[in-house]
Amino acid sequence: MVCLNAQRIEQLLKLLETDGNDCFLRYGLALEYMKGDQLDAAIEQFNAIFRVDPNYSAAYFACGRALVQQGKVAEAREKFEAGIPVAEKSGDSHLAGQMREALDLLDQ
């Protein structure tokens, strides 16, 4: 399984060489890093997405989850709070709700 993960990461990195601003590829890469517990690398990819497209709402939720896994609760809270209006603006009330639930869990 780790081998497949490494292959996917390698493929995504190669694709990003042709278009480093492709947020969809970066998001996929970040998720692969998360699957492999490479959380710093995942967060780095999410931050690259925010620089290119601050309206990429799914990245806020996933980045917040990665930060929670690292124990960085305050930073995770910031990502969830920032992502809620982005998700709402794009019409994704389900994702906004997921981020609200994540915030509620952080408050417990």
Where are the model-predicted features located?
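Canonical positions in the second alpha-helix
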Residues: 14-15, 48-49, 83
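Structural marker of alpha-solenoid helical repeat scaffolds
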Residues: 18, 52, 69, 86-90
